[in-house]
C-alpha cells in the first residue's frame, strides 16, 4: 500500500513537471499565432556571437560554445536554431528541478504546483527569450541544489559571470545555499573553501570589467553579424548585439535609472506592484520556519538582490522574476533540509500560477499572455 502511494506521488510529480515543460514550450512557440511571427523570439546575437570572431568580450561564452559546436547552425534559419536551443534549455532546467524534488521526496501537491507553474520560473522562461537568463538559471540551480565541493562551486561561479554579468546578482543566493544549507560547509572567512570562491568570483568580475570590451568598430562588428544572422538582419533595433557588448556600465546606469523614474512619475510603475507582491509572498514562505535572525537577514538579502539589476537594465519583469526565482530555489533547498513542505502560503503561491508568465520588458505588459488573449479576441 505504501509503495503504491509512493509510486502514484512520483507519477504525479512527473506529470506536473512534464506539463510545465509543455506549457512553457507552447509559449516559446507563440510565433505560430502572433503577428510578429519568428520575431517574437526577440534577439539572436547572444547565441551566435563568438570569441573566434572578435576576441574575448563580455557575454560571449554561450555564443562561442554554440558556434564552435555548430549547435546554433542546426537549422538553415537561425530563428529555428534559437527555438530549438531554448526548448532544450527549458527541458534541462526543469529536469534539474524535478530530479531534486524527487530525490528529496518533495511531493506536496500545492507546493510543487507553485514551483512548476510559477509565473517567474519554468513558464516564464518560455516567454523570456532573446537573452541569456535561462543559462544563468541553469548554473544557479546546479550550484544551489547539487554542488558541495568548493572547487566545482567556484568553477561554476566563474563560468556564470562569463555568460552574463547579471549572474553576479545571483551570487548571494548561491553563497547562502552553499555555506548555510550544506552540512559539510561552514562559513569561515579565512577558510580556503570560502576564500577560493570569493576570489574566483572577483577575478571573473575584474576580467569582464578590464578585458571584456570590444576592440572593433561598430561597422566591422555588424558586417560579421550580418553574415551570421541573415534572417535577423535589421529586424530588431538591437539585432547585432553591438550595443549590449560595448556600452559602459555608467551609461546603462544613467539610462535605466531615468527610465524607471519616468515610469514612476507617469504611474506605470503600478503594473509592477502585483509581481512585486508575489516576491513578498515568496519571502514570507521562505522565512516562515527560520528562527535565526542572521539567516533570515541573509536569506531576504539574497532574494531581493537581483532587483538591483533594474539600476543597470530596463527589463523590470525579468529582474522581478530573477528575484522570485532565487526565492523559489532557496525555498526548495530549505524545505529539502527541514522537510516542511506544508505552508499556509502554498495556496496563495499556487493561485499566482494563474498569472504565468510574467513579462520581460515594458511596464505596461506585466502578464503578456493574458494581455495577448484579451487583445486578440476581445479588443
Segments and roles (model prediction):
Residues 60, 110-138:
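Aromatic- and kink-enriched transmembrane "portal" helix at the membrane-lumen/periplasm boundary
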Residues 97-119, 293:
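Transmembrane-helix signature of polytopic, membrane-embedded enzymes
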Residues 171-199:
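Perimembrane helix-loop-helix junctions
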Residues 121-132, 266-271, 278-335:
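Membrane-water interface signatures at transmembrane helix termini and the short loops
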Residues 151-176, 307:
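Membrane-interface alpha helices of multi-pass inner-membrane proteins
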Residues 139-152, 184, 338:
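Membrane-interface transmembrane helices that cradle and orient dolichyl/undecaprenyl
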Amino acid at each position: 500500500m505504501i509503495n503504491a502511494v509512493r509510486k502514484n506521488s512520483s507519477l504525479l510529480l512527473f506529470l506536473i513537471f512534464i506539463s510545465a515543460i509543455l506549457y512553457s514550450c507552447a509559449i516559446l512557440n507563440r510565433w505560430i499565432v502572433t503577428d510578429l511571427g519568428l520575431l517574437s523570439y526577440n534577439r539572436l546575437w547572444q547565441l551566435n556571437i563568438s570569441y573566434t570572431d572578435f576576441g574575448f568580450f563580455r557575454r560571449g561564452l554561450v555564443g562561442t560554445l554554440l558556434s564552435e559546436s555548430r549547435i546554433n547552425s542546426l537549422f538553415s534559419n537561425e530563428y529555428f536554431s534559437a527555438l530549438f536551443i531554448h526548448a532544450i534549455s527549458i527541458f534541462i532546467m526543469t529536469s534539474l528541478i524535478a530530479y531534486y524534488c524527487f530525490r528529496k521526496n518533495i511531493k506536496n501537491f500545492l507546493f510543487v504546483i507553485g514551483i512548476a507553474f510559477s509565473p517567474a520560473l519554468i513558464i516564464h522562461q518560455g516567454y523570456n527569450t532573446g537573452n541569456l537568463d535561462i543559462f544563468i538559471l541553469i548554473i544557479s540551480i546546479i550550484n544551489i541544489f547539487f554542488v558541495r565541493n568548493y572547487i566545482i562551486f567556484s568553477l561554476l561561479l566563474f563560468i556564470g559571470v562569463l555568460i552574463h554579468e547579471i549572474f553576479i546578482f545571483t551570487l548571494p543566493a548561491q553563497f547562502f545555499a552553499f555555506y548555510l544549507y550544506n552540512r559539510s560547509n561552514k562559513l569561515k572567512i579565512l577558510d580556503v573553501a570560502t576564500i577560493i570562491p570569493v576570489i574566483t568570483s572577483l577575478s571573473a568580475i575584474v576580467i569582464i570589467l578590464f578585458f571584456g570590451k570590444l576592440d572593433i568598430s561598430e561597422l566591422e562588428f555588424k558586417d560579421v553579424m550580418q553574415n551570421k544572422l541573415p534572417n535577423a538582419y535589421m529586424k530588431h533595433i538591437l539585432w547585432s548585439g553591438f550595443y549590449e557588448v560595448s556600452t559602459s556600465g555608467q551609461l546603462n546606469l544613467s539610462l535605466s535609472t531615468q527610465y524607471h523614474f519616468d515610469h514612476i512619475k507617469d504611474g506605470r510603475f503600478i503594473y509592477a506592484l502585483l509581481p512585486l507582491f508575489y516576491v513578498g509572498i515568496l519571502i514570507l514562505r521562505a522565512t516562515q520556519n527560520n528562527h535565526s535572525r542572521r539567516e533570515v537577514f541573509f536569506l531576504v538579502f539574497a532574494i531581493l538582490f537581483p532587483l538591483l539589476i533594474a539600476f543597470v537594465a530596463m527589463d523590470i519583469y525579468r529582474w522581478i522574476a530573477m528575484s522570485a526565482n532565487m526565492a523559489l530555489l532557496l525555498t526548495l533547498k530549505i524545505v529539502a533540509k527541514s522537510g516542511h513542505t506544508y505552508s499556509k502560503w502554498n495556496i496563495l503561491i499556487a493561485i499566482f500560477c494563474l498569472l504565468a508568465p510574467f513579462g520581460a520588458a515594458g511596464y505596461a505588459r506585466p502578464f503578456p499572455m493574458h494581455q495577448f488573449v484579451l487583445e486578440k479576441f476581445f479588443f
